[in-house]
Amino acid sequence: MENLALVTWTHDSYDDIFPVYFGNIEKFFPSLSKSYVLINEINDSISDNHLQLINDENVSYVSRWLGCLDHIEEEYILYMQEDFVLYDHVEEDKINNCLEFLKSSDCSCVRLIRSGLNSLDDKVESNIYKISHFKDPNLSFTHQPTIWKKDHFIKIMEILSPQSIRDVE
């Protein structure tokens, strides 16, 4: 999975779930080559397999994201949160299919979980459906496991300019 980084948004107050979350990533996604943790302060319970990028809680949510993304060199990011716990092995061929789709399309992202808010009328590839966000652009970003083109993620964050995490829920 060349050029893909796992990016976990979290907070040190959720450290009770870290052993399960990060342990399951290492167990069920061993081929993952790069993992970043966007967190408010260094947490010793997170292994060195995951590079911790510290964000300042005193600035806006968008600024925290953009500041951390400056340190991520990969072109694609897999957005996660600490409560998106893996419970089985990652089907890497499907992740690779999603990456190939993103590389060859103008789509910004591929959500890895279906939302009940969108119909599945526009199938563009096996198990990939195009969703229009024109009805409600605030749904361009959702807190779901999603593979993003990093540059598109940055544009969405700049457009939405959320001041807090609640502004994009």
PLM regions and their residue ranges:
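N-terminal anchoring/stem segment of glycosyltransferases
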Residues: 1-76
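A structural signal for short, well-ordered beta-strand segments and their strand-loop junctions
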Residues: 36-38, 77-79, 108-113, 147
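Short beta-strand-to-loop acidic/aromatic patch adjacent to the donor-nucleotide binding site
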Residues: 75-85
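Short, flexible, basic/aromatic active-site loop/helix in glycosyltransferases
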Residues: 123-138, 152
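Conserved donor-nucleotide/metal-binding helix-loop-beta segment in metal-dependent transferases, i.e.
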Residues: 88-118
